[in-house]
A protein has these predicted regions:
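Auxiliary N-terminal substrate/complex-recognition segments of SAM-dependent methyltransferases
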Residues: 1-239
Length: 239
């Protein structure tokens, strides 16, 4: 389905002309329509949140698979940098024996996430926090799709000109948030735990090195997306 067909499907005929005008101005079709499908659920999106991508659906799918093989009890999950809430809400819906918390530094993003929580009849606990600053318990699963684009990296204009830079860019060649999370994560993990990251396709080995630096007694797995690009890091803590 191309963008015009997408507009025709989701917009009222009276709004179609204005929608096409915005499309020609370079505004993403998802922001024009105001929602996006993710893992079979519908999420409201606007310029305060990142538009969920297929790769993030893959992150969720792989994480669900690892959780089902790794835990036999009710689990506590934390989503760091939740944005629209798509990861947290999907995990809450798909993993019945779970309690899901989700945080973001952006209050505007949290407003959207809480709306999506209601619309999808999920029970995620959303709270405002700069990484772990307001987190106060331990988790079995910590998942994050943090900002990972380096400031000097070229990206498409439609992304750069519309999506929130706070959700896109990171210092330290895009590695800042991985470093901060991994540096501080130990005190928020239960004895048996999983960390799941979406990453930039050139960052895999560097993030593996960070895992070895901060969490030396864990197993780390680098996985590719459907485009055969390095895209996901999974860390398994067994004790």
């Amino acid at each position: 389905m191309n963008d015009i067909e997408y507009l025709k499907k989701y917009l009222n005929p009276a709004d179609l002309e204005e929608g096409i005008k915005k499309l020609k101005q370079g505004i993403p079709v998802q922001y024009i329509v105001g929602n996006v499908n993710f893992y079979g659920y519908t999420f409201e999106v606007n310029e305060n949140v990142l538009i969920p991508r297929f790769e993030t659906e893959e992150l969720v799918e792989k994480t669900i698979g690892f959780i089902s093989n790794y835990f036999e009890k009710e689990i506590n999950i934390l989503d760091i940098g939740t944005g629209s809430g798509c990861i947290a809400i999907t995990l809450d819906k798909e993993i019945k024996n779970s309690k899901v918390d989700a945080l973001d530094i952006s209050t505007n993003a949290l407003e959207i996430a809480k709306k999506n929580n209601l619309k999808n009849h999920s029970n995620v606990n959303f709270f405002h926090s700069n990484l772990f600053s307001n987190a106060n318990k331990k988790y079995d699963v910590i998942i994050s799709n943090p900002p990972y684009i380096a400031y000097d990296e070229e990206i498409m204009d439609i992304v750069k000109n519309n999506e929130p830079h706070i959700a896109l860019y990171a210092t330290n060649d895009g590695l800042y948030y991985y470093d901060e999370i991994l540096k501080n994560v130990s005190k928020y993990l239960n004895d048996k735990a999983i960390i799941a990251f979406e990453i930039g396709h050139k960052q895999g080995e560097k993030i593996k090195d960070l895992v070895k630096k901060y969490l030396p007694n864990t197993r780390v797995l680098l996985e590719q997306d459907l485009q055969k690009k390095d895209r996901f890091i999974f860390v398994f803590k067994d004790k």
